[in-house]
Swiss-Prot record:
Family (UniProt): Belongs to the FKBP-type PPIase family.
PANTHER family tied to this protein: 39 KDA FK506-BINDING NUCLEAR PROTEIN (PTHR43811:SF19), FKBP-TYPE PEPTIDYL-PROLYL CIS-TRANS ISOMERASE FKPA (PTHR43811)
Name of protein: FK506-binding protein
Organism: Neisseria meningitidis serogroup A / serotype 4A (strain DSM 15465 / Z2491)
Function field: PPIases accelerate the folding of proteins.
Length: 109
């Protein structure tokens, strides 16, 4: 079983993302072979989620933890913390490692 790899690309200086907080993010996701499968930037539409409650894949719930507003990270997410054996929507194959570049735009009180 692989483990989540978190690389800080840019440190944030705003409020901190913690479990139970609602956050707004931008993201782009790639497969290991470089195929981009999704990007909120391409849609110009950020995503708002509640952190740590299972709304998103486990790699996101853990990967955004401790991040501060304005920060950017690269998350390398093993299959077990992504979509696992089932894959997703015909776009993400089974057992795929996922690579995301994420930006934390806002943490809500």
């Amino acid at each position: 079983m692989g483990s989540l790899i978190i690389e800080d690309l840019q440190e944030g200086f705003g409020k901190e993302a913690v479990k139970g907080k609602e956050i707004t993010v931008h993201y782009t996701g790639w497969l290991e072979n470089g195929t981009k499968f999704d990007s909120s930037l391409d849609r110009r539409q950020p995503l708002t989620i509640t952190l740590g409650v299972g709304q998103v894949i486990k790699g996101w719930d853990e990967g955004f933890g401790g991040m501060k507003e304005g920060g950017k990270r690269k998350l390398t997410i093993p299959s077990e913390m992504g979509y696992g054996a089932r894959g997703a929507g015909g776009v993400i194959p089974p057992h795929a490692t996922l690579i995301f570049e994420v930006e934390l735009l806002k943490v809500y009180e």
